[in-house]
Amino acid sequence: MLLKRHIRLRTRIPLMVAALLTMSAVLVPQPATAADDKKVLTVAVSQSVDSLSPFLASRLVSTSIHRLMYEYLTNYDPKDAHAVPGLATKWTPSADKLTWTYTIRSGTKWSDGKPVTAEDASWTFNKMMTDENAATANGSFVSNFKKVTAPSPTELVIELNKPQATMAALDVPIVPKHIWEKVKDFSKFNNDKEFPIVGNGPFVLTGYKADSYVRLEPNKSFWRGAPKFDELLFKYYKDGDAAVAALQKGEVSFVGDLTPAQASALQSQQDIKVNDAPGRRFYALATNPGAQAANGDKFGNGDASLLDQRVRQALFMAVDRTTLVDRVFQGHAVEGEGYIPPRFSTYYWKPSANQEIAYDPAKAGRLLDQAGYKKNGDGKRVGKDGKPIDYRILCHATDPEDKAVGQYLKEWWADLGIGVTLDCLDNVSDPWLAGDYDLAFDGWSVNPDPDFVLSIHTCGALPATPDDVGATDNFICDKTYDKLYAQQLAEYDAAKRADIVKKMESRLYDLGYMNVMAYPNAVEAYRTDQIQSITTMPEEAGNIFGQDGYWSWWSAVPAASGSGSDDSSASTGVVVGIVAGVVLLVGAGVFFGLRRRATAEDRE
């Protein structure tokens, strides 16, 4: 079978790739020196920027860049992720905890020289409260706000309708009022036409070309101190092999989302350090619950059989997560259970032995029989319409793990009598938002405070109408879940709140619309002859890319031996191609296995 042939190839990939990458490194050594001796830190990325507007962006690459451009009221400490000052130096609740007063840092300026004041924060939040388009990305943080005012340049007051536990973790970029008040339509403004973009974070965005590069320069007046590199460049590589080759040649400083084969090959490379740390993401299989809008209108074309909870549980019962971790992730992941990764121990939940949907294909078959989806004479499960069931799984065309997992699902579910069609696209957003899928590979990065990733499964996150775009991830709308969400948001006692969050995870698990298969590690690499030191988050066994803060790129110290990567190609928007020798040597099957994960999920 194709699947088994693919598996055998993957078991040989690490040795073959190691030899190929080593050969390419020997054949094409390159100095890591820019023409003008600027210290340039170049980060290879594969995920496209969805928007440079912090009011619209949801993808990881975009939100990571926004953390560099704009200050938030608070930040997360890189050691243990507790709340630390950001734009606000302190925050104090009233006795009833319905009014929060923030002291705004005095003496700081926007990159155009104008002072940063509490009025900027007040305007940002009020805009989100009064314009649904401005609430697209982060509206859940302000949905409980009653009133926001700025009595003085250094005082921000937020009044709440009900207690809200996230007041020290409002992950909302504060923007300059004098710039953004000129925007007429927040749904269409992507903040990508005029440069430099005015901000107050550690970096100033000075250049951007879609699917080519994002260029940032140090904010010399940043209150924590200016970054030490002269330039930070996010350079786009659609192909993971090209990014790895560029790292070897010194054309980039950092590459993330490495495949196990790439990580293994790079371990022995001179001047390259591989970082393999527990990740902050989950990798899941989302099931279409019947796409709907907040006004009650139904849309999309999800298979009706998936509305039966027994069917959803049977499908997940036929997923061998141990095999996925061992064969697809090759040990660089942990088996999935609850919604929140084990890295966040306070909120990590796992099902009891009686609740767990363990791998049991025989039991899955019996469950489908009980649900009325029995096999016909050809061994195919038949739906209520009398037709054989064939599920479409939406996957990312640039993601080899989606494809590899999809092949396993094809084999496992075929044994159940269920067909699978992998619908692998460069752009999964359009069919997803339209509800035109049966199942989909899904994943999100989780923040130290999990409120946001919890909020995207509430009824309030649904689009207003089928023509609108909501904050929902998968159109889930469950009253029991919503009730628990409201309870956790209003609970200030940390232990009690964690217990409620775990009940929410239990509810999601039982519903079967969000089946977590794995928690992938953050596997990444950087050149030590370009980067002398860099902060991971958490500092012990943490990741570099996609942090809950700006710590990595802000803290990075240039290596004394080099001047950073050569950014000459990015200045003209040219994307470096893959090393020709590697293309010629790597066959189609090996090439597929070599490719790294091209995205941390497009919807992240």
Model-derived segments and their meaning:
Residues M23-A32:
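C-terminal segment of classical bacterial N-terminal signal peptides
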Residues A44-A95, N126, V198:
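N-terminal lobe/hinge region of extracytoplasmic solute-binding protein
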Residues Y526-S565:
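Long beta-strand-rich cores associated with HINT superfamily self-processing modules
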